[in-house]
A protein has these predicted regions:
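Soluble "head" domains of membrane/secretory-pathway proteins
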Residues: 1-194
Length: 194
């Protein structure tokens, strides 16, 4: 993005940026700003997402208030008024009406909004979408980390993946190599040959 830390430093100077924003404590190796919406696991943890539920070290995690999922909304054939969606904080441009359903295959919203939508007179059904393998789109494994066809993972059924802690060793195999090869070569700057 053009509005990142490095752009601010170039425009305002290092000293001003340091005073205005404080010192940089962590800087990504790739020097890109990263957006972390919610950190659910850290070094030393094993992360698993099963049917949309997050597990860390085998323990189910509480859903955060306001967490969004995607929902299928079946209507009587009429679309929901875009002003109504907008007033609920749902971006109408992210809601695709499908007359064949009839309704919407995917509306991103939280559970409270899903309950409100279910109460609308034109709505006959609201159900949370859970991605399972094989997903609707065949390239799914190539769109999610570790970007390998060997991992039949989706957004809602992901892992388990072990996140190594500092100083720990991981036994590498051809099966788990896609999980760790980028870390080893790009971030730890070690050569890796198979």
């Amino acid at each position: 993005p053009t509005d990142d830390y490095y752009t601010h430093v170039r425009l305002n100077g290092r000293e001003y940026s340091k005073k205005a924003y404080g010192p940089v404590i962590v800087r990504p190796v790739d020097k890109k700003d990263n957006y972390v919406k919610r950190c659910v696991a850290i070094a030393g943890d094993t992360l698993l997402v099963h049917d949309g539920k997050v597990y860390v070290n085998g323990i189910a995690q509480e859903n955060y208030p306001g967490i969004q999922n995607t929902y299928t909304v079946v209507t009587n054939g009429s679309p929901i008024n875009s002003k109504v969606l907008d007033e609920m904080g749902i971006n109408p441009q992210e809601c695709w009406f499908d007359a064949a359903l009839p309704g919407y295959r995917s509306i991103p919203m939280n559970e409270d909004d899903a309950k409100k939508v279910a109460q609308m007179g034109i709505v006959s059904e609201v159900r949370q979408n859970i991605d399972v393998y094989p997903p609707d789109y065949p390239d799914s494994p190539l769109m999610l980390f570790p970007f390998s066809e060997n991992f039949k993972w989706t957004r809602d059924n992901y892992g388990p993946i072990y996140i190594p802690a500092k100083g720990e060793s991981v036994d590498l195999t051809l099966e788990n190599l896609p999980l760790y090869e980028r870390i080893i070569s790009n971030y730890e700057k070690n050569s890796l040959e198979v």
